[in-house]
Amino acid sequence: MASPDVEYRCFVGGLAWATDDRALETAFSQYGEVLDSKIINDRETGRSRGFGFVTFKDEKSMKDAIEGMNGQDLDGRSITVNEAQSRGSGGGGGGRGGGGGYRSGGGGGYGGGGGGYGGGGREGGYSGGGGGYSSRGGGGGGYGGGGRRDGGEGGGYGGSGGGGGW
């Protein structure tokens, strides 16, 4: 009963900003028929977020691609290829996918941002400041930007904090 819903999809991370959907499809098509290839772009800037997905027609092609492409060079960047986690979560999974914004900072923004998360939970300004301190790879800026939920000005601090990666 679940077989029509099964997708043989790979998550591809560490992509160069210059890599587009077509380049992704070309790189992976050697492993089997590619049904879809999609680079995820930032909603505000339109620039690549450095990851995407490739959907294959069958499981063997997907597994061969993971085996063959993980750790390989694509457009000058060493990429990470894993099986995409897509089961059982439309809305919930989307929320966690968006949460990948603070994970993509290397985890430092999320872990170090604990000060901003706990201490600045009510005050957007403090949350944004915490994001700035914890942003070793600029990831803290994304998390600080999340402070906008608490106050519109917190987002502003988060944005500038992200630029000053430590």
UniProtKB/Swiss-Prot annotation:
Coiled coil: none annotated. It is found in: Nucleus. Its main location: nucleus. Residues 8-86 form the RRM domain. Keywords: Nucleus, RNA-binding. Residues 68-166 are annotated as: Disordered. Pfam families: RRM_1 (PF00076). One of its GO terms (cellular component) is nucleus. It comes from the Eukaryota. GO terms for molecular function: RNA binding. Residues 88-146, 153-166 have a biased composition (Gly residues). Predominantly expressed in meristematic and growing tissue. GO terms for biological process: RNA metabolic process. May play a general role in circadian phenomena associated with meristematic tissue. This is Glycine-rich RNA-binding protein GRP1A.
